Amino acid sequence: MTTITPESLPRHELLGLHARVAADTDQSRVGIAGRVVDETMQTVVLRTASGVAQVPKKGATFEFRLTDEAAAPDNGVGTAFKPAGGETRQTTGESVAYVTVDGGRLLSRPERRSENGVDSKWR
């Protein structure tokens, strides 16, 4: 399995990752948090405690929670080991890193975004 770093996160599959809207041009969306259950070219769909929320990528900043080997201490710039805003969150004992990504970096079809970031001897 490839380790996800702050630099490589925009090229990876986001489905299944826990995400939180850290900032948004629409203040009503700030703080929405949940698991990524779908992604389109321009939106991220999060399953939250109260249902499903579709958040436009443009104008949003997302904070992704990465666990275990993806949270290695050498992840570098852009990785925090505490969430932005200082609130605490419980985990099940695994290593956790929080990676903040501008939604503009995610604007594209998910399959194209991941294809373009991967070196392949077949292309």
UniProtKB/Swiss-Prot annotation:
EC number: 3.1.26.5
Entry-linked Pfam families: RNase_P-MRP_p29
Source species of the chain: Halobacterium salinarum (strain ATCC 700922 / JCM 11081 / NRC-1)
InterPro entries, sorted: RNase_P/MRP_Rpp29_sf, RNP1, Rof/RNase_P-like, Rpp29/RNP1
Subcellular location: Cytoplasm
An example Gene Ontology biological process: tRNA 5'-leader removal
Protein name: Ribonuclease P protein component 1
Keywords: Cytoplasm, Endonuclease, Hydrolase, Nuclease, tRNA processing
One GO CC term on file: cytoplasm
Annotated region described as Disordered, given as residue ranges: 73-93
Description of how the protein assembles with itself and partners: Consists of a catalytic RNA component and at least 4-5 protein subunits.
Origin superkingdom: Archaea
Role of this protein: Part of ribonuclease P, a protein complex that generates mature tRNA molecules by cleaving their 5'-ends.
Catalytic activity from the UniProt record: Endonucleolytic cleavage of RNA, removing 5'-extranucleotides from tRNA precursor
EC class: hydrolase
Family, per entry: Belongs to the eukaryotic/archaeal RNase P protein component 1 family.
GO molecular function: ribonuclease P activity; RNA binding
